Amino acid sequence: MEFVTALVNLQEESSCPICLEYLKDPVTINCGHNFCRSCLSVSWKDLDDTFPCPVCRFCFPYKSFRRNPQLRNLTEIAKQLQIRRSKRKRQKENAMCEKHNQFLTLFCVKDLEILCTQCSFSTKHQKHYICPIKKAASYHREILEGSLEPLRNNIERVEKVIILQGSKSVELKKKVEYKREEINSEFEQIRLFLQNEQEMILRQIQDEEMNILAKLNENLVELSDYVSTLKHLLREVEGKSVQSNLELLTQAKSMHHKYQNLKCPELFSFRLTKYGFSLPPQYSGLDRIIKPFQVDVILDLNTAHPQLLVSEDRKAVRYERKKRNICYDPRRFYVCPAVLGSQRFSSGRHYWEVEVGNKPKWILGVCQDCLLRNWQDQPSVLGGFWAIGRYMKSGYVASGPKTTQLLPVVKPSKIGIFLDYELGDLSFYNMNDRSILYTFNDCFTEAVWPYFYTGTDSEPLKICSVSDSER
């Protein structure tokens, strides 16, 4: 009954609402109803302004329909199912050979076909083993009965597997909970460590402030005393100046001696201590936080300055004095020895590392495509550029909307770069002591490319691959 109901429903869905026959070349209109193409064309034949659906009457401003090959295939399936069902029904009711109109009493073992007597003599079944239906049915019934036990065993085995797999969900939940607690604990340790570091550094700054303030006040007292002495001397000099010549010259030696022995206290100057910290290895969350976003950056040959030599794997670049003859490209750097990465970033978070070694000059960062290609050095006053670099005269500098002097505690030989496009953050890490060098907070309005400036020495810049960075 369920098969019959399903077949009836399939036939209804495969019928055209206009001609009530099986759909021929079915088409679908925008409201979702289906029709024969010819029926819909006739229905809309004399219409100009509006074209209503023949079923729901929803009107469209223009003729619009699309062919539905999937529905055409389903319609053909519905036809075949109806034909087969009718054929089976007749066979079941009559058990007669449709070809010879004789009772079906025999069975071809090789072809697995039910035959009448006349069919068994046909050339198709010559030399085939043919037996009575009763015997063939008994044989196949034994085969089916023999397969019952293996089927039951298979069901039992799979049910045990289901129970086992079900228990794995409990195991998974426990492991996930353990991992969650482990991560929470680790990050709590990092948070506490950072909090303690912050409090300690703030105390040090406060102590230093009080110490400097005390010395500054002491210096102010010395200067005030010096001013008082000068004022007293001034009054004394003014009194001596009106004395007689003899009295003035008698005391001239002591006055000169007193004036010459006056010394102005040195001005007190101060410089705050450079404070910083780096996460110890046991608390270092840097890998866990940013390494999952690591990308394999490769260099774009079409942007490389003519005097830059890019390695075969496009992971390293160095400057050479010999200038190569290469095709012009508007995105190529022709004045400064620079090159871009081949992958642009317009969303998401990305991390890559670059070995700078002991190069005397280098610049790393990101830039927008609007960056000018004809400037001599780093474009500190231009927009669309965020980078840090080392300069032979000015040391380490962050260049972007403004220029900032950097004072790394440890000289970096490998730089980590982390870009959070949506947040507008670009952070640079000194991978030697795992400290942060600088972070830009901006709003990226266009896609950005990794940027590499080599300087004019022969030492290369090397982009670390993912496998190298994980070591």
Swiss-Prot record:
Keywords: Coiled coil, Metal-binding, Zinc, Zinc-finger
GO MF terms, alphabetically ordered: SUMO-ubiquitin ligase activity; ubiquitin protein ligase activity; zinc ion binding
GO cellular component terms, semicolon-separated: cytoplasm
Residue spans, zinc finger B box-type: 92-133
Any one GO BP annotation for this protein: negative regulation of non-canonical NF-kappaB signal transduction
Family membership: Belongs to the TRIM/RBCC family.
Protein name per its UniProtKB record: Tripartite motif-containing protein 60
Gene (UniProt): TRIM60
